[in-house]
Structure formats: structure tokens, C-alpha cells
């Protein structure tokens, strides 16, 4: 089954870490990505730019309006995602639990990806 692992964290938290902690964090990410590539579970993933660079499009008075900034103000940001193909939701959650942002006050949301027909998996 395919899952989207949504990475949530606090903007700028890595700048609060020491250089050694930051290096270790990025090293863990590299290790997880390498492992998932080797096992064939990794479909893809990307980090997202800072929320200050976000544009939000909303319908206002029947017309689309482009606004600067994220959809809602929050202490956490949607920071990126991983798409994985693994045997179970438990395995997807195991992968998410290893993501280092979780230890620093972030969260990983595990969501099944719908199939091409638009039905729940």
C-alpha cells in the first residue's frame, strides 16, 4: 500500500540546534532515505520552502484571489513529505516514528494514498 508521510515541524527549529546536532539530524534523514531506497519502499519526497514564501489561492466574491502566506497561521508548518509503498499502515508509522523532526516537537502524519480510481485503499 502507498502512504504519504506529511512532515510537520516548527519553522526555524534547526537553527536552534548546535552544528553537531544539525549534522546528526541531516545524517539521520540521509540514512532513512538510503534505507527506504534500498528496500524499494521510497516512492519520493521533498522538503518545502519556508512558509513565508507561500501563496494561497481562495475564492473571494466568486473570484480567485491570490494571498501571500500560508492558509492559516500556525506554530507548526507543513515542511515536506515522503511517499512510501510498504506492507502495512504499521510499517508506514514505524518509518514516520524514526523521522528526526518528531523528536524536536514536530509530527509525521501518515495518510493512505487513494488509488487511481479515486477509491480508498
Please describe what each predicted stretch is.
Residues 1-121:
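Conserved, structured core segments of small domains
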Amino acid at each position: 500500500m502507498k502512504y504519504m508521510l506529511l512532515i510537520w515541524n516548527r519553522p526555524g527549529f534547526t537553527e536552534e540546534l548546535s552544528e553537531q546536532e544539525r549534522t546528526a539530524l541531516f545524517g539521520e534523514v540521509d540514512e532513512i532515505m538510503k534505507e527506504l531506497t534500498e528496500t524499494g519502499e521510497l516512492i519520493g519526497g521533498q522538503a518545502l520552502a519556508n512558509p513565508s514564501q507561500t501563496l494561497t489561492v481562495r475564492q473571494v466574491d466568486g473570484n480567485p484571489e491570490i494571498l501571500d502566506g500560508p492558509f492559516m497561521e500556525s506554530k507548526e508548518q507543513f515542511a515536506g513529505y515522503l511517499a512510501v509503498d510498504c506492507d502495512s499502515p504499521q510499517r508506514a508509522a514505524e518509518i514516520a516514528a524514526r523521522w528526526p523532526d518528531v523528536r524536536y516537537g514536530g509530527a509525521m502524519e501518515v495518510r493512505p494514498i487513494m488509488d487511481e480510481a479515486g477509491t480508498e485503499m
